[in-house]
Amino acid sequence: VHFTPSQILTDKETLEAVKPFVGTVVTGKELTAMLEAVNRLYRQKGYVVCQAVLQPQRISKGVLTITLVEGKTGAVSLSSAVEGKEFKTRGGYILRAFDLEKGKVSNYREMLGDLVKFNMTNDIQLSVDMRAGQEPGTTDYEIFVQEPDPRTFTLFSDSSGSKSSGRYRGGVSFTERSLLGWRDRLQLIGVFSHGSRSFMGSYSVPLNSFGTRLTASYSYGRVKVVDGPSEDFDVKGHSQYLSLRLDHPLYVTSTSKLTGYLQAARQTSETEMFNVLTVSDTSVKSLTAGLEQLWLKEGMTLYANGQYIESWLKDYTFDNASRYRRLTGYLTWDHRLWKNWGYTVNAGAQRYLGGGEMASGDSFYLGTSSGVRGYENDTISAYNGAWINLEAKYHLDGKGSNVFAFLDAGRLSGDSPYKDKSLGSVGIGASWRPVDWLMSSATISFPFKRNVGSEHVSKARFDFVINAVW
């Protein structure tokens, strides 16, 4: 048996495949089986644009020629998945995700794997269409690109602020999802309340087409105590935070993504009274190694994040320094049970691993913005702790509107300035999305404890969030 030249199969592989038929009298049935043996090799290697065929020929001296038709890559084009809408992502960013070299036979299995990996690690979605090439013996590929809106502008308001600096907040955010066309993301956020002003900005640039990213973040905030025991002391503070983070996907399938990341950060903060007396001046440097897991299934979503953090605290006010280590974790599980019913579980935890004194901002807090609704933000704290939220939901439509009931609980352990070590609450809430650009939610929480330390807790607490997105 003689074979035409192949880019994929070696002479040894092809001869081994037809070995059972060599030296025998073959009929049409055996010829079909012989071709199938060769085509099976192509499929095992992941090549679907290749095929062994028999061309019309005259058999001479018992030698049969099998023609190996291998669809070499011809034209590769990019098109928008939405008719009439242009995509903004640079073609080079998309094409470098695939091994589609002109004149080379492309591996379908590898291309499918690259497609899945790209779609799971990017905010744009691709699909690939194959067709017979314009040139004989070639296969043309058309890649369809579906992008989210290139930029979003958001106005928001909520009741998640601190009582001491203003519970009710407003803000604005701007996101450019592909600033230079490489899916490099720029985000700017401004938040204000009665006694606080803060700004946050980040720029994230991909290092390849498969989710490896470098993100630089900066934030600055000023705060003034406008309520509480310290109001008359003209307490003001300001802080800065700078971080650099590297993300890299470690394992990606169509339903799962495991990402590892490293982060270096530095935070400085200073608090003063009467504009002259500095009561706190600290700097915290930290190194973080973490893992993020995303798992998707129809009706179910699981997200988990675990971190190991090493920190160095410098207190300039009292000329003290310390080094400490901790583990933190977060998990959310959302499950759509049947029809419109579902539930969500959220949990967070921290474990102090040892070292010196920990910065107050790194303690584990319990309160409305930290796991247990119905109380003021950061009501109590300690070095160690955990909280859990259980929510039962009824979905009103497919746009995000729902009603829900919840149970929150949290507990602290380790070093703490507070006598109380646990908080809990129940409540009800609703989310409403009347139009695509407007989303709102509200909750009424009923705390189990009416007195925490010297603070009296209201019977019920109302919270809201309103987002308008363009």
Label every model-predicted segment.
Residues 126, 151-153, 180-186, 209-215, ...:
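Repeated loop/turn-to-beta-strand initiation elements of outer-membrane beta-barrel proteins
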Residues 137, 166-170, 195-199, 238-242, ...:
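Residues that define the transmembrane beta-barrel architecture of outer-membrane proteins
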Residues 151-161, 172-178, 182-194, 199-201, ...:
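Transmembrane beta-strand segments that form the barrel wall of outer-membrane beta-barrel proteins
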Residues 174, 430-434, 439, 444, ...:
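Outer-membrane beta-barrel "beta-signal"
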Residues 176-180, 202-209, 247-253, 289-299, ...:
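Outer-membrane beta-barrel proteins
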Residues 219-249, 253, 267-274, 444-461:
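Outer-membrane beta-barrel translocator/channel fold
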Residues 270-402, 406-409, 413-414, 455-456:
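C-terminal outer-membrane beta-barrel translocator/porin domains of Gram-negative envelope proteins
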